[in-house]
């Protein structure tokens, strides 16, 4: 080894010892011919001092991020010069000799200057990600991720799970997003697909009798740009045989409990549950943030006989902003712009004066009886503001759910370090294909119905015989775990019977021929004694970003893509050469296709 000790591990007990350290020059300070350098390695920082005239003279040439090997004697710092912010702050190393292992070019941004961290653009940080990761905060994010991996593995290993790798080159199967395709050179005109999840393989492993599988899996989805999404991401993927929903939830809670212990937080279990229907009714979201107590009040029946045209709609709902009546007009106008940015025409409101009198444009257009009763109906008090949404139920609730979150931010209702977990259960099995497409998802099949979770989710037992007769009424045997308004995991009990799977495909408009072509291997496997099974997948990037207090999952990924799916470091994606294109067979037709007559 090129060193005897790590910089961040030196203590008073090491005083008098001769040590050799290696690392990077984090800071350099000259004081009357004596040079002080903060030497950084993976463990932290040690102050090394160049007092000897010969070494001090040579040290004048050292610059930020030079790589050094220094040898010297550990000494206690003079009284009053200790640094309580450093683990090694009681000591320093008096250098007797050093070697420059490598020099550094001028830096594109300062690594150690915490005050300028927010001034460096993300594109620059990602382009020089290897420098960005020298910052302790960024490096510690990856270490936290490693610790989370270890904690999860420890839990799963204790329950006799087997870690199994599944293919990353597979066939294209419809799973809810577009596939990344890889040309197969040895079979021109055909393509592999990178997996959107290990879903089908982990189910096949249950058919194989493995019973308890897990994997920290890389997944790939060619989605349109969405904030804080990555085209490649990581799941902690878990599947179990001979289980029901309660078994999977209990295991998931054990994993989450151990992972959150890494930051000193004890999750209270069992984690509360809410039905999907109640989540949408009360919070306007299937991933509600329950750190604050603001609920949506339904007002459709209250305004059933209204003369106000805006409220003559399928749905009317409201949320209350405590103290919101004191907002200036410009802030109320800003709320309208906020709503329009979300596709709404605006956000109607009533101001409840300190004397109880109602103000605002809505108050002038509703009946006397409605004016007298609306504050009590929604739970508003003098000084509050009532925001309304009216229209179709789905979009109106979504707008009120977003308003609820915005109110919490404006009123500073969310405390640092506060955690709220909830299971969302009993989601619909199917949704309108038009709604799925409108929300940015890919609707599978050629029916007006598509799966809410995926096509392999079992209906709840009470809907097993009727889900294809009344798809809109069927509930899925599924469960999502939500933390602070973020969906951090989702799972379900799977279909394990071939006839049930074929019925689901039929509801979704997937023909027998397409089902055989895309999923024949799964249907065949179900014919050979597939056990009942279920599982869950955790969004590992999101979980680690929450643990570390990061705003973006990019901070917890070693080499992330930018928001547009571009890697500024390698400049990927990039064009390929004509020779690569020819050899890959991208433009070739599959032999089977060449033998078929062209469609007219």
Curated annotation (Swiss-Prot):
Purpose of the protein: Aspartyl-tRNA synthetase with relaxed tRNA specificity since it is able to aspartylate not only its cognate tRNA(Asp) but also tRNA(Asn). Reaction proceeds in two steps: L-aspartate is first activated by ATP to form Asp-AMP and then transferred to the acceptor end of tRNA(Asp/Asn).
Biased composition (Basic and acidic residues): 580-600
Gene coding for it: aspS
UniProt-annotated binding residues for ATP: 221-223, 230, 487, 539-542
Gene Ontology cellular-component terms listed: cytoplasm
UniProt site positions, description: Important for tRNA non-discrimination: 31, 80
Subcellular compartments: Cytoplasm
Enzyme Commission identifier(s): 6.1.1.23
Stated family: Belongs to the class-II aminoacyl-tRNA synthetase family. Type 1 subfamily.
Binding site for L-aspartate: 175, 221, 453, 494
Reactions the enzyme catalyzes: tRNA(Asx) + L-aspartate + ATP = L-aspartyl-tRNA(Asx) + AMP + diphosphate
Name of this protein: Aspartate--tRNA(Asp/Asn) ligase
Spans annotated as Aspartate: 199-202
GO biological process: aspartyl-tRNA aminoacylation
Superkingdom of source: Bacteria
Cystines in this chain: none
Listed InterPro entries: Aa-tRNA-synt_II, aa-tRNA-synth_II, aa-tRNA-synth_II/BPL/LPL, Asp-tRNA-ligase_1, Asp-tRNA-ligase_1_N, Asp/Asn-tRNA-synth_IIb, AspRS_core, GAD-like_sf
Quaternary assembly: Homodimer.
CDD domains, per the entry: AspRS_core, EcAspRS_like_N
Chain residue ranges for the region called Disordered: 564-600
Keywords assigned: Aminoacyl-tRNA synthetase, ATP-binding, Cytoplasm, Ligase, Nucleotide-binding, Protein biosynthesis
GO molecular function: aspartate-tRNA ligase activity; aspartate-tRNA(Asn) ligase activity; ATP binding; nucleic acid binding
